[in-house]
Amino acid sequence: MSLHKHRSRMVTQGLTRTPHRAFLRATGFDDAALEKSMVGIVSTQGENTPCSMALGPQADRARLGVAAGGGVPVSFSTISISDGTSMNHAGMRMSLLSRETIADSVELVVRGHAYDALVAFAGCDKTLPAMMMAIVRLNVPAVFLYGGATLPGHAASGQVTILDTIEAVGRVQHGTMPAAELKAMERTCTPSAGSCPGQFTANTMAMVGEALGLSPLGSAMMPAVYSERLAIAQRAGEHVMRALAAGGPLPRQLVTRASLENACAAVAATGGSTNAALHIPAIAHEAGIAFTLDDVARVFKRTPLIADLQPGGRYLARDLHEAGGVPVVLKALLDGGHIDGSVLTLDGRTLAEALADTPAPDGKVVRACGQALHPTGGVAVLKGNLSPDGALLKIAGLKSLKFSGPARVFENEEACMRAVSTHAYQPGEVLVIRNEGPRGGPGMREMLSVTAALYGQGMGEKVALLTDGRFSGATRGLCIGYAGPEAAAGGPIALLRDGDMIHIDAEADTLDVALSDEELARRRAAYQAPPQARLAGALEKYAALVRPACLGAVTHSGQVDWPYETPEAE
């Protein structure tokens, strides 16, 4: 692919593009710059979340790399919703929706201005899959870079993270921790810029980026404040110029069924966030690959848990970085026969070639597959008469994989949180939160405040929680989410009543309610959906378009080649 055949020439060349060039000159372009390729540098840099506060300097270094490679970097920004400050109130409805908005916004800018390539930076949970979705949708030479996790803090009890603080709220409610100790944790648990430091959603999806080949190997687990991130960002700018000159590899050459399965294996092997089972199918959708929760489940089931990472384990992202990073996990899986080494990486080498010199697992943070922590992955997909489309349970760290108990049904998260805060529930119950799915919420809120309060009260495995909503990557305990079909789509969860006996068996991967088909049919015939407040704005559009969670909760029909990508298309 010649540099003079790039689509930015549609904007910069010819008599009719005189006004376009005038606008570009106003931004600092000169004659030489107008002859070069234009590369978008996008980030979610902002002050609304610590996750994004380290991205600006990294994006600036990517600009240097693009310039060194002979291109013109053009910076722009997009939004980020902080899950940390939107949780446990109506603002969480905006979180998953923001994934689509971010992907759409990046597409609009890159296509609207005919940029030739892209370097994308993200920090908070939904921003990572959003950027990867945009990259695959655009299918231009691109690099995705995660901004990195925060460092852990320290309190009187020792090392603390945001998860400790969230769960400590439940201990204060339960009377087992003084409020002053919680206040001290609040002040110290997040001492630097960066995302949550465990194998929660952000770090899980950063690992997915490496496994898919969209990110440089070894980049994901490095803390945000490490100066080496700046060098990685500059190399990303240089790389994208080489890929532009060579014509690839392009994102849809990297995101294949095999690499998607590799990504699922990495999630399972590390006890990663259940949200990955929502985001990986959405990334696949952008490549035109039908990859559903059933595909995710098959990989999860055959992959051993080999990394001892929080929230189910002991270690943080920094510990994994110091043990060799994501490549150590991938090499252990490759040696164990659990991933495909023939897929391409960002630089065009096969994964097996790129991992050839990777060190062996340290035996603590990461183990060899022969010494796995558990024979199957850290996330289970459950099906049964209560979840025909599937539901997700993070099993990493659980003492028991079976639970049966009567349902206590809540129509939304707030009702359940009130009950948990006032201890208006009993050990042995299954707390059911419904009407929180993608369409019914709308927005599929995370239930971290509820699950953390239960865990803090010492009830993490004494009760179970079931919802058609989502859970945070930081969630631990007997928490089953993403149950489909959701209540708003007429799923069985809508038919539950207080006292119905629910059976959970993560060994057999089943989730059932002890009701006959006839009784379920009678209830369905009599069912009346609860009234929903009128929607407007972004939520109205989202509820009208969103597809089921088992398909990734996507909002468009799937990737097709866009007919206006090259100058010749004019």
Swiss-Prot record:
Gene Ontology biological process: isoleucine biosynthetic process; L-valine biosynthetic process
Modified residues (N6-carboxylysine): K126
GO molecular function: 2 iron, 2 sulfur cluster binding; dihydroxy-acid dehydratase activity; magnesium ion binding
Enzyme class: lyase
Catalytic activity: (2R)-2,3-dihydroxy-3-methylbutanoate = 3-methyl-2-oxobutanoate + H2O; (2R,3R)-2,3-dihydroxy-3-methylpentanoate = (S)-3-methyl-2-oxopentanoate + H2O
Coiled-coil segments: none
Active-site residues, Swiss-Prot/TrEMBL: S472
Regions crossing the membrane: none
Alphabetic keyword roster: 2Fe-2S, Amino-acid biosynthesis, Branched-chain amino acid biosynthesis, Iron, Iron-sulfur, Lyase, Magnesium, Metal-binding
Binding site for Mg(2+): D83, D125, K126, E446
Oligomeric and partner information: Homodimer.
PANTHER family xref list: DIHYDROXY-ACID DEHYDRATASE DAD (PTHR21000), DIHYDROXY-ACID DEHYDRATASE, MITOCHONDRIAL (PTHR21000:SF5)
Protein name according to UniProt: Dihydroxy-acid dehydratase 2
Source organism per UniProt: Bordetella bronchiseptica (strain ATCC BAA-588 / NCTC 13252 / RB50) (Alcaligenes bronchisepticus)
